[in-house]
Amino acid sequence: MRRENPMSALKPETHLETHDVTNQPPPFEDVNLFETDRALCDAVESAGGGMHRERLSAFGVRCGSAQVAEWAMQANRNPPQLRQFDKYGQRLDEMEFHSAYHALMDFGIGAGVSSAAWTAKQSGEVLHTALEFLMAQAEPGVCCPMTMTYAALPALRQQPQIAAMWEPRILAAKYDPSSQPVANKNGATIGMAMTEKQGGSDVRANTTHATKNTDGSYTLVGHKWFCSAPMSDAFLTLAYAEGGLTCFLVPRWRPDGELNAIHVMRLKDKMGDKANASSEIEYHGAWAERIGEEGRGVRTIVEMVHHTRLDCILAPAAYMRQALANALWHTAHRTAFQKKLIDQPLMR
C-alpha cells in the first residue's frame, strides 16, 4: 500500500561511508504560510478582511504542510497525458492526471479558492486574493482552473437561465473530476478558449463561426490555439455569429447526454506549469449556448478576463514571496564561518 507522503516519511541517511552530511537546512515544510507573512497579514487587515484571519491561518498551515509539498512535487513530475482515443479507436479527448493533481484540486476548491469571492458575506474579494496568493505558493498550476472558474461567474450571470445551472456548482466548493453531464455533478470548473493561430491576442481576427439552431442554441466550427484546462466542464469562447463576434458557453457534454464535438488536438509542451494542462482544440460542430448579445462577445467575455488578470498579478507576487521565504529559511539554518548565513554582513 502506497504511503500518503512517502518522501516525508523517510528519514534521510546522513552518515555515509565516505563522509557525514551536516550543515543542511531542514525541509521548508510544516510552515504556516499566512502567519509567517507579515505583509500579507497586514494587507488583509487593512483591506477590511480581518474577519477571515482564522480561516486564512488554517489554510496557510495546509499550504505550507509536508503533504501539500509532496502533492505539488508529484503533480509536476507526472504531468497530464492526453487520451484522444480508446483502444477501439473511439474518440475520448480525455486528460489523465496524477492522483496528486486531483488531491491539490480537491484541497484548493474545497477551501474556496474558486468560490469564496462570491460566497463570503464580507470582503469576499480580499479573501479570494489571499487564498489564491497562498495556493500559488503551494502549487501554481492548479490555480489556473480555479482562477477561470472564479472569473467565469460574472460573465455567466449575463445569461440568468444559463447561470442557474452552473452557478450552484461553481459556488459549491466541491471538486468533481468525473467526465459526465454537469446536471449529474455537484461541482463544476470552467475554462476559457479565445486565441486562434492567425490572430493571437487580436481576437477580432478569429475565424471560428457559429450557426444558430432552431431551438436557440448554436453550432460552432473552428479552432482555438490555446485552451487552458481542457478537462473543464465548460468553456467560455468566442465565435462569429450573424450579428458579429459573440461569446458562447461550450459544455463538454451536450444536453442529450452525448460528448460535445470538442476535439483536443494536443497538449502544449511548456517550460513550466507542468501540473496544469494547456491545449489546442477544434470545434467540429460543437453545441453551444450564447452568453450576452450577438456582436458583443468581447465586452461579454472581458468580464471573465478582468477577474483572471487579478490572479495573473497575484501569481508572480506569490512566486517571489515563496522564493524569499525559502531563501530566509535556508540562511537561518546554514552556517558559514562560524555564523548563520542570516547573521553575515551581506544579510544585515
Task: Give residue spans per PLM region.
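Extended, charge-enriched "interface" segments that sit outside catalytic cores
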Residues: R2-K121
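A short core secondary-structure module
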Residues: S217-A261
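Internal maturation/activation junctions in enzymes
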Residues: I162-T208, K212-G216
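A glycine-rich, basic-preceded beta-loop-alpha segment at the flavin cofactor/substrate interface
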Residues: D256-E258, E280-T308, A325-D343
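Flexible, small-/acidic-enriched active-site or ligand-binding loops
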Residues: E258-H284
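Glycine- and acidic
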Residues: A130-P140, Y150-P154, M192, Y218-V221, ...
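Internal helix-loop-helix
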Residues: R91-P181, C227-A229
